[in-house]
């Protein structure tokens, strides 16, 4: 048996499972096992500004820009680009000819922007 990748969820929105002893919980849509070439990520190359990710985004967002801002840790700019509206469907990453892990960067950015929003709310609450 070759290398396989096990996902909690489907091939586009699923998250890789590092521990196969993890329980399957109610919110899990399924377990996906990828083998062969499907288990490997393509080699990332530079964005060619083709905008396929933009066309594929059901929320009308600009995934290439959000990934770029996330890489550069520009959280305020990322918040202004409505990163929290991303539904993490994976369509952008699936269509990217440059094999950029857009969804990984967007998820990281959403976490950081969420922390920024919570910190801002906490600071505002302490002022009252």
Per-range role (PLM):
Residues 1-98, 103-113, 118-128:
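Redox cofactor-anchoring modules in respiratory/redox and cofactor-processing assemblies
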């Amino acid at each position: 048996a070759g290398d396989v990748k096990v996902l909690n969820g489907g091939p586009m929105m699923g998250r890789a499972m590092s521990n196969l002893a993890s329980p399957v919980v109610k919110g899990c849509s399924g377990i996906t096992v990828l083998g062969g070439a499907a288990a490997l990520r393509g080699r990332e190359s530079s964005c060619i500004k083709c905008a396929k990710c933009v066309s594929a985004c059901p929320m009308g967002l600009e995934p290439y820009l959000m990934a770029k801002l996330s890489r550069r840790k520009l959280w305020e700019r990322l918040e202004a680009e409505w990163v929290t509206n991303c539904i993490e469907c994976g369509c952008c990453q699936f269509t990217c000819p440059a094999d950029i892990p857009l969804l990984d960067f967007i998820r990281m950015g959403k976490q950081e922007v969420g922390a920024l929003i919570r910190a801002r709310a906490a600071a505002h609450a302490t002022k009252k």
